[in-house]
Amino acid sequence: YLFKLKEHMQRLHYSQSVMRFDEIVDGDTLIDKTIELVRANAFRETVHIRAMVFVAGEGELGARGPVSTAITVVPRPLPNAVVDGCSAQVSSWVRVSDYAMPLRVKCNANYNNGRLALIQAHADGYDAAIMLTNQGKVSEGPAMCFFMVRNGVLVTPSVTSDILESITRKTILDISREYLDLDPV
């Protein structure tokens, strides 16, 4: 089972446009290649798929091509936090603003900010980091969304809180409305 592969590739297709690549790699092609790679390796465990489209070669900083792709699939067992929960630290690293970088797109550069926060959290003995916006409001964690239930209400940062509008986030919001009778705030 590949979790919302089509939606992930549609977002990658959109992200290429925002990044102004000369060539836009078709999402269906990436889906076919990803399925082919998973089948060829006969994975039977939880895996992490990373599909990337990037400017290749030795172009200048403003280069928009040539465009290349890479798809990696590696086994990644579910983290203990899924069963046991985790400890989290509010990071001193502030989430990069959507005004500075297009955080709504899937872009490798967007991960570096969260990477620094997670390294700090681990060094301080925590499992995870929670990042705040420049205004001191909760944004998200490195490679994760933030949700909590307070007084029977599902609370999550808005899309204007410097977050990736993630497919996982949308899925949780849909499930909470449809099956849990929780309307998010």
What are these regions (language model features)?
Residues 46-53:
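ATP-grasp fold ATP-binding core
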Residues 1-36, 40, 54, 60-185:
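Helix-start/capping segments and mature chain N-termini
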